[in-house]
Amino acid sequence: MADKLPYKAILARKEGMTQAFDEKGNVVPVTMLKAGPCVVMQVKTKESDGYHALQVGFLDQKPARLNKPQRVEAEKRKVAAKKHVQEIRLDGPSDRKVGDELKCDEFAAGDVIDVVGHAKGRGFVGVMVAWNFKHKPRSRGNMNMRGPGSIGMRAYPGRVLKGKRMATHWGGERITSKNHRVVAVQPDQGTLLVSGSVPGTDDGIVFVRTARSKRPFAKA
C-alpha cells in the first residue's frame, strides 16, 4: 500500500479483561479488544478536502435509525452505514478505496499503542473523593465534617477564584491511556490482547492507535 500513515489506527470494542503469558512466561493482565473490521467510508485527499485522511466506520447501523442525510450518503458511497465513524489522518495519498477493510492484523505483537476512550461516569462527588481533602475535626459542635470549608474572601476580589477545587462530576471524560503493549493478535477471532486496563466500560468503543509518545517502554 502507498499509505503514509503517521500511525496504525483502528476502532475496537472493549470485551473485558483476562490474563495471558508473555514471551518470558510472566502472567500479564490484558484487556481484550474486538478490533475491526472497520470499513473505509471515505477517502479524503488534499486536492478535494485540503488534507489526506481515511474515514472508517465500525459496526453496522440499523436502517431504521438512519436519518435522511446518513442514508443518502451511504447509498452514494455504496457501503453500509455504520454506528461509529472515525477519521484517520494521513501524511500522503492512499491506495485504499471505499469499501476496503481495516482488521486487527494491522497491528503486531510487541507494538506500543495508545487507547482513546471515555472513562466510566462516577456521578457527582464531594471534595474528599474528588480532591482527596481531609475531613474536618469530628468533635462536638461540628455539623459539616465533609464540606470544603471557605471558598473565597469578603471585600476583594469578592468572588470565587477560577480553578477552585469544589464538588464536581467525576468521570465520563475522554481519556487517552498511553503506552500499552500489544501482547497478542488473534486474527481468527479479530481481537487484540492489550497490556493493562483501558478506559471505558465493557462493550464500550475505543480508538486504538500507534503510540505518539517517544518513551521507550510500555505498560506491563
Predicted regions and their residues:
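Extended basic (Lys/Arg/His-rich) segments that typically form rRNA-contacting surfaces
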Residues: 1-220
